[in-house]
Amino acid sequence: MSDKESITQIDHETVMGKIIYLSNKEDRKGQERGREYFIINKHANGHRKIVAHCEIDDRPAVMRDITYSLDENWLTTDCFVRISVDDQFMGSGWFNFSDGHAECETTTALEGRVSQKMETNGHLKTFQNHAIACDAWHLRLFDRNSDEKIQNTGEILLSSPDHRGATGPMLFPITMNIEYVGEETVTVGAGTFDALHFRFVGTPGLPEEHPPYDIWGTNDGDYLFLKGAVGGYMQTYYELVDLY
């Protein structure tokens, strides 16, 4: 019996994992302050989707659920974000991206029912939904063939300008400056990987500048998040501890 005649069809690849959030502050060194569970599906046509559940324990606690999809060229297609803050509903929104436009339909505890439509420079290349697992996906925008060691990503839209992603969700435009550090071999709880090390060094357009953020993703074209460290006032560390 050929694959097409089989009653079942599994043409996609699936990766599941867990990321822990730890404090790097002197008085809380190594204390777990949150966690994230994610599932990534890579379809036969190159499209990919991530579903992530994120928990930040620091008061006021934040809980976030996202579903984010991209096409075969890593271009954003759609995203769903639901957040609660202090164990209370904050907002729920759906985002859609097409050539030249980004749209949002959302309901929030503060703003009520909101519809947004923004013009974009062609098809939006990346969207920040605040799931840590997605942070490494921005790194594909860096041109490693260029002599520039710090590059601007161009336009990016966020689901929230808050550093913890605890507002909205609604569209908010910024750009990001990324520095390429180099290739490394990285060992985390989930194993040892060939990695690319980058650093977010600027967030033009954000109301409050984000502290420098070192991030390591797999060096295999999938940019799977491995670990990250944020300096400044945040002093937090993220690590992939489980991978299935």
Description of each model-found segment:
Residues 2-108, 155-244:
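Acidic, serine/threonine-rich low-complexity disordered tracts
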